[in-house]
Amino acid sequence: GLLSVLGSVAKHVLPHVVPVIAEKL
């Protein structure tokens, strides 16, 4: 379902987004 797709996208995006946020903090 849609949630499954969003979950898959999140798993691919988060590893890239988290380090960027960490650098800004």
Swiss-Prot record:
The keyword Secreted applies. Keywords: Amidation, Amphibian defense peptide, Antibiotic, Antimicrobial, Secreted. It holds the Pfam family Caerin_1. Its main location: secreted. Expressed by the skin dorsal glands. The modification Leucine amide is found at residue 25. It is found in: Secreted. GO terms for cellular component: extracellular region. GO terms for biological process: defense response to Gram-negative bacterium; defense response to Gram-positive bacterium. It comes from the Eukaryota. InterPro entries: Caerin_1. Belongs to the frog skin active peptide (FSAP) family. Caerin subfamily. Antibacterial peptide with wide spectrum of activity. This is Caerin-1.10.
